[in-house]
A protein has these predicted regions:
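Conserved active-site "lid/cap" helical segment
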Residues: 1-83
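Conserved catalytic cysteine-centered active-site region
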Residues: 36-58, 91-122
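Fold-independent oxyanion-binding glycine-rich loops
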Residues: 13, 86, 110
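Short beta-strand-loop/turn "lid" adjacent to the catalytic site in phosphate-handling enzymes
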Residues: 78-94
């Protein structure tokens, strides 16, 4: 048994959402919904975040990983495990992405070379 595993811990995690805010009224205007439907009152949702065309879940995940590394004050060579948890595998650069795992691409982008990488998705 690897004794190092007994001392493993999560030092940090993070998320990143796009800066662009779209109100629920703007969002609903694109769809085929009745104009008098008050979605904010019905749902309590004020709006959604919208990424740019070049910014998919991969790019958002890379930004989140950078935040996490900064918070923990950790260098790429100190990271042993990269887990990407996402509902979608979309990349502004790649479009729909299936293989290799997004965690592998995130690790490569951040200079993490000696880590186990895997995705968790629905």
């Amino acid at each position: 048994m690897n004794q190092g595993l007994l001392h493993s811990k999560i030092l940090s995690f993070a998320s990143h959402i796009p800066d662009n805010f779209v109100s629920i009224d703007e969002f609903a205007a694109v769809g085929d919904l009745p104009g008098k439907l008050d979605l904010h009152r019905l749902t309590g949702i004020e709006g959604h975040r919208k990424s740019d065309a070049e910014e998919g879940s991969l790019e958002l995940a890379i930004k989140a990983a950078e935040k996490s590394m900064t918070r923990a004050d950790i260098k790429p060579e100190e990271i042993d495990l990269v887990i990407n948890c996402a509902v979608s595998n979309l990349s502004g650069k790649l479009g729909l992405h299936i293989s290799p795992s997004m965690a592998t691409i995130i690790a490569k982008e951040l200079g993490i070379e000696e880590a186990i990488c895997f995705d968790i998705s629905n």
